[in-house]
């Protein structure tokens, strides 16, 4: 899948995930406060991929699509706009190393997985998230959001 298809798919997936946030969790905040949500973005690729790292030349684009506040097309700007400034999303990339996202290599080829839950569970279980990355931005005791990019 090309970058032009992969990045919008990532953004749509994140938007759909945040669409599932109960409205009451936002409205319960005081009228003049902004709720913080943290989005943990995890990357994986199949072992039989055409390249060793599909993110090698796409890291800056992926980060910008999530966090760039200078454009209304980023996830952060979009969520800020549709929530009228009541919800702020910051995306974190635990696999970022020396300026490049290093995707986790899944254990099986794409054909060996029967559904996406199998590799989603594998990713969450095997990708290390450093303690320095805040999982709970709204302090409700739960991880706010995880986005998986394959």
Where do the PLM segments sit?
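Bacterial N-terminal signal peptides that target proteins for export
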Residues: 1-11
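Propeptide-to-catalytic entry region of secreted or membrane-anchored zinc metalloproteases
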Residues: 29-150
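Gram-negative bacterial Sec-dependent N-terminal signal peptides
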Residues: 10-18
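Intrinsically disordered, low-complexity segments enriched in Ser/Pro/Gly/Ala and basic residues
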Residues: 1, 24-26, 108
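C-terminal segment of classical bacterial N-terminal signal peptides
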Residues: 17-27
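N-terminal prosegments of processed precursors
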Residues: 6, 14, 28-33
């Amino acid at each position: 899948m090309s970058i032009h298809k992969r990045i919008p798919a990532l953004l749509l997936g994140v938007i759909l995930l945040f669409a599932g946030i109960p409205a009451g969790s936002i409205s319960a905040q005081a009228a003049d406060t902004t709720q913080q949500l943290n989005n943990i973005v995890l990357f994986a690729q199949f072992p039989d991929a055409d390249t060793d790292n599909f993110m090698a030349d796409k890291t800056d684009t992926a980060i910008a699509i999530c966090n760039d506040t200078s454009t209304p097309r980023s996830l952060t700007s979009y969520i800020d706009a549709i929530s009228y400034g009541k919800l702020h999303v910051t995306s974190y990339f635990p696999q970022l190393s020396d300026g490049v996202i290093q995707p986790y290599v899944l254990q099986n080829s794409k054909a060996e997985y029967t559904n996406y839950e199998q590799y989603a569970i594998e990713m969450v279980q095997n990708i290390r998230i450093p303690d320095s990355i805040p999982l709970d931005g709204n302090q409700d005791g739960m991880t706010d959001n995880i986005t998986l990019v394959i």
